[in-house]
Amino acid sequence: MQLVLCLLHFIELPLKHLFKFYVGPTSGPRSWSSRLGKQISTLPDNLENIVDFEPVKGRVIAVDDELLTNSDQKYAYYLALGIQNGAEFLIEIMGLCPDLPCEMNVARWLNPASYAMRKYVQTKNPTNALKRLIVIILNWYLPLFFEIKKDCHVKYGALHFFQAIRYAQECFTEKEKKKAWKYFKINAYMAHPESVLLAGICHPFKSIRVKCAEIIIKARVKARRTNEVRPFKVPELNFDAENFLEMIDLSRPDVTPPPLLKNFSDDDLRLIAEDGNIELPEIHCHSIMNERAVKDTTTASQREIGQKKSHEHILNLIANRASIPYKHKKGDFVPKK
């Protein structure tokens, strides 16, 4: 079985601890204890006009609207584009931007990122801590977030992980790297040889496909000889790697072949290495759809009796979402005090 862990959850962990580094520890599920933290978490009650802020160079680029699957993502996306292009541009596109999420939730890191960006654009003289958070959000967190959503197949998992390292090397300070590398190391599941080799056999460059096919075939021979259950260990990372194949040591004797390729013979792999044609199951490198499916299944089982009724409930729910998009929340209909 191919082990797949959510990359969107992975990128939240370094961001969480970099927020803690600059804003301090949380004082609850919706706030921080520091002055800046309180200003960010209470932003809905203290919104001000956008000032002539200093634009921040970032990596967030234009994405298709279909990738922006909820209001939080749309808000973060348009605000990021505005900060990169300046106050006049941001004011022009604010009509495309949904309202600020009504409550800050530190368990949903896209939400604090949006709050920090909104705080920045209304602050004439932002602190260095706030500036650094904006640099990290625009050059590391949000670019990775949208890249993972765009190329969501598991075959891209190792490439996204390597990109996370590369972006961090370019925009993190040495102190920030010291804080963040720990969480790269303990969550390097997508840098496991099985994920790296899967990305390699699907790579557009023939030389990389051929190299990975040879490693997979050799690993298969060794696995057949031992006939043991493979131990899955988080690999040691090379943070100075020039490409994704170098971020771990693929010459180690404990390298194992990707389970997702078990139905492909050695000859199939050699052919794939030559022409690049491969069909794999649609498995994502993030778990957003899984989490939504779990929620829908739980709701259906609570409201219906029997598997057939529960299944019909889920199908109706999916059809309703497609035909009647959800755009309103309870707060839109309840007068604010």
Regions of interest found by a model, annotated:
Residues 1-337:
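Alpha-helical structural modules in large enzymes and assemblies
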